[in-house]
Structure formats: structure tokens, C-alpha cells
Swiss-Prot record:
Domain RRM: 27-102, 419-502
Organism, scientific name: Rattus norvegicus
Coiled coil: none
Subcellular location: Nucleus
Residues where Phosphoserine is found: 21, 108, 349
Entry-linked SMART domains: RRM
GO BP term (any one): mRNA splicing, via spliceosome
Any GO molecular function: U12 snRNA binding
Chain residue ranges for the region called Disordered: 1-26, 107-133, 215-254, 337-369
Name of protein: RNA-binding region-containing protein 3
Amino acid sequence: MAVPEPSMPLSRGGPGSASLSPPRGDRTLLVRHLPAELTAEEKEDLLKYFGAQSVRVLSDKGRLKHTAFATFPNEKAAIKALTRLHQLKLLGHTLVVEFAKEQDRVHSSCPASNAEKKKRLDDTVENDKEKKEPDVLTVENGIAPNHGLTFPLNSCLKYMYPPPSSTILANIVNALASVPKFYVQVLHLMNKMNLPTPFGPITARPPMYEDYVQLHAPLPPTSPQPPEEPPLPDEDEDLSSKESEYESSDEEDRQRMNKLMELANFQPKRPKTVKPRHVRKKRKIKDMLTVPSPASQSLHPVLLPSDVFDQPQPVGNKKIEFNISTNVPAALNKDLETEQNNEEKNSDSPDTGLDDSNTGFGKLFPKPNVNITEEIKEDSDEMPSQFISRRELEKGRISREEMETLSVFRSYEPGEPNCRIYVKNLARHVQEKDLKFIFGRYVDFSSETQRIMFDIRLMKEGRMKGQAFVGLPNEKAAAKALKEANGYVLFGKPMVVQFARSARPKHDSKEGKRK
């Protein structure tokens, strides 16, 4: 700390020189009015800066508050410090410095300061640490302080392990298998020692110590510790029973040794290959409709549907004959003969129609049911196909009463007929293959033109999500699809089928109006 010297130091001959004149051989100064803002250490540093050898700072209370005793190495240094410090202004306080009197020397003879006390204590502690025995380990260097084992190692403890044997190695292997952390630490140690990894095939057995030198018998298994006050033995116990117990324990030890030797020499089995878990896929609609084939490994004979259910007889044009009595007029007989001839011709060529030019009563034939024949043809065509049948469409459709209750069908209008249909109210699980499974039945895939015109566009994102446009070959197929598929429940939601609005361009309608 740089302190400016006073411009005019007091001379000894001036006023107050009696207090400044030092007694012979005195080298202790009394410094008064030290600033209260300074700590004891700062006051001590201030006086040592002016050459003090030892400083004792008094307390801030009492008669000698804010004072300090400074001892210098000689009288000349004390006089020089007095001339520099006396009447020095420091932090608004004027210092007053004088030589200590005999009555004040009692205070200065006490220990120098608290800081010196601390230093002396630290020095003594360090000396005590140095005097400690170097063999005894501290707590920080104990067995395992990270795991709570803070006590030091015993310096007298020394280990002398027996040479490796098959029994010891077998016990180590069992410990490795039962303690995973021990197994990991052994692998770490092998890695640090640059040993070959144990993950390959089984290595050759090295020569063992016990093959050349006969080792001592294995130690018996450790028994639980006896109680502090064991019960007294009975007087009736014989020595023969004790001897038999010792013999049986020796036999058990031998059997245990043999088992351990077998385990040590036993080669491990190959690990079983775990089959990957089969994830069951979601069944498609066409897979759910087809009947699953029976398992080939079953012991029961395979039954066909024809063996279990009665097969319906194929419906065809049956011949209806009338048995007319013999007393029929001759004119009717001629008509019957001509009708029979026509019937035979019709059976040979079914495409030819009935001759309307024949006169007479003739035979009465039933009107063929066109709807039944169409259904039979459609069902027979679609049995092996990959599209839905009309019966399944009818079963899956909701009724007209249900359509009236649903808000989706309230303002329903089929629209202007064209070859494209618009489908809405589709579930989020619906895919293009599901729509193809339904509307593909109205397309003849053998025709390349119809196959090209058949188009499905399913909207999966945005504002049009859950809607689709299906392009069919012609208006007739589109009208049929609208009639049969409207209201069909697909994934729990009924479809709303309409004719698409943008199918026909606007200029066609204008040209039609001009014409």
C-alpha cells in the first residue's frame, strides 16, 4: 500500500517532543486512531509496510480501541516509521504515533495477533502430519471409499493364494455366471492385459499345476458360525457316531469334487436358436370371404362342402309336357306334332325363338325367369374371381329406412349419369385395393380398353380426405355400380355413391343447346 509521506515531519525539538523521544533501547510504537473501516489484517499489513517486524492489533472496544503496537527490528527503524506515520491522514482519520510506555508494554508482550495464532496452529498441524507414520493409509486411500469402505487397509495383511486347480477354476466360473458385474470386470481386465477375447471357440486346456504336483485336499464347505454360548454336549454321545460323521463328510467332499471336475471338463452346449416371433398380419376382405383350407396335418379325412351340404340342382329350361287323352280332335293332333318338332329344333339351337306363324292352341311353356338366370351366371362367374359378389353387396348394404335416419343421406341426389362415380364417407382404413375389390366387378379385365378406363383415385390427405373417384368403362356400368354399392358398409361406415359432376365438359352441353 503506497502511502504519501507528510510534507513536514515533526522535529524532536518542537512541541510534544517529549512523547516522541524514544527511551534508550526502545523499538515499540503505539499507533492510535486507526480507521475503523480497516480490518485487523489490513491494519497489520499497513504497519508492516512501514517496516514493523511484529504487529499486535487491539480490539475495537475499550480504552485502547483502534490502536496497535508495532515492534521494529531496531530503534533507528522505529524512529523512521514514527516520522512517516505521525499526523498522517488516512480515510478521514489522523494517526497519532508515539513510543510505547512501560505500562503499555504489558499489552504488547501478549501474542502478536489472531492471524499469527492461526499461522502457528497451521504450522503445528502440518508438523504433526509430517510426524505421522507413512505406513498407515488415510481414509481417502482406504479400501473403497466410493462404496462406503472408508477404513484403511491393514498393513500387516498379506495374501498368499493357492495355485489354480480345476476346483478353484470351476468355482470362479460359477461366480462369473452368477454375478454379471464380476463377469464385466473380468472382461475389462482381460482387455487391459491384451489377452485374447473369450468370445471365440473353446481354446485348448493348458497344463495344470495339479497335473505335476499333488495338491492338498479341498477345504470343506464353510459352516455357519456357532452361537456365542453353545449348548453343552450330551453325555450319551459316543465316539463312534463322531467318527461316522467325519467319514460321511469326507465322502460328500469327494463326490462334490468329482462333480466339479465333470463340470469343469464339460463342454458347453450350443445356444438354442430362438425363432423370430411371427407377427400376425391383418386379414384382407377377400381373405375373410374365402373359406380357409383345412390343415393338411389333421388326422381326420378332408370333407368337401358337397359331402356336408345338399347341392342345389342347376336350374334350367325344363320340358313341360301335357298328357292329352286319345279322344283329341285330329286338328289338335297335327298341332301337337308340329309343336314337338319345333321343340326339338329349339333344344338343338337354343338361340332361335318360337315361331309365331303357327296357328292353333299349341303347348304352353313357362316364361323363363331372366333374373334367376342372370344371378346364376353372375355368381358362377364370380365364384373363382377376386371381386365381391352381388349377394355380399346386398348383405352389406343398409336399408332405405336407415338411410333416411343418417345425416349423410339426407340431401342425397344421384346426379347426372356419366362413366365416373364419386364415393364419400369412407373410413380412414380404406385403401385403393378395397375399392378395386368392390368396383372391379363392373369391369371386364379381359378387354384392354375397359382395363385402361378403369381408374381409382382415393384422397387420403387434405380437404378431400375420405373421398374417392372411380372411373368405369361406360355409363351403364357406372349406373349399376351406383345402384348396388350405394349404402354398402365398408369398415363400419356406409358409402355414399353418386355420379361425378366433372365427368362431362361444359362445351358439350352448349353445343347441344345450339343444335
